[in-house]
Structure formats: C-alpha cells, structure tokens
C-alpha cells in the first residue's frame, strides 16, 4: 500500500492500493486495490473489502463496505458493535453530481450527533445498487440489492 500524509491508529490493516491525506483510526481495515483520497476518515474498526474508492467520506465505527465500491462525499453511521453495524453491499456507487456535472453537498446515511453514541439501528445498502446524492437517510434504513 502506498501511503502519503495519512494518520494511522493502532492495528490498522491496509492491504494494498493508495491512500493520501486520510485518517485510519484503531483497527480500521482496507482490502487490496483501495483508493482512499483526501478528507476520508475511517473510525474504529471501520473496514472495506477489495477495490474500494473513498474521498471526503467518513465511516463511523464498525461500518463495513463490500467489494468494488465507489463511495465518495458520504457520512455513514449506525450500529452498536462489530456484530451490529451499518453495511454497504458489493458493487455499490454513490453519485454526487448535479445534471450539469457540478459537485453537490455530501450525503448523510445517519448523522453524527446520534451515530457517535453507537446506539442507533444500522443502515444497510444492498449491493449492485447506488444512490444519487445528496440524500439524507435515517437509521434503520434497508435498501434492497440492485436499487438506485
């Protein structure tokens, strides 16, 4: 893994790819082929499988991302533990541009004031799907696979 100007906590596992200007807190984990760009924070034990792209994204503790995901300009919270956590299925993409190609504000899947307490229902975003931002999604939301 090529790492430039990142902050790493203890027991962080970065298995391959590129990370720049990002923060990985204790126990964060990214699989091979990761592309983690500036402004990204993986909080404690947040993780992604192989070939995950992140930019200006905050994953609260325990959040799990599947493989082949592009998840930029997002905050994802929810869940209470390693066994009860928010999850994004494989092959998910978050689109965050206007029809004119201009960047919009970030999407919120959960929120910080409640998510930081680790006492909210997890959010599940099914694989082979996507979202067109900006969106605000509440705790406990379940989106089936293949949905946009």
Question: Where on the chain are the PLM-derived regions?
Answer:
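Flexible, glycine/small-residue-enriched loop-and-beta-strand segment within the central core
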Residues: 1-135, 147
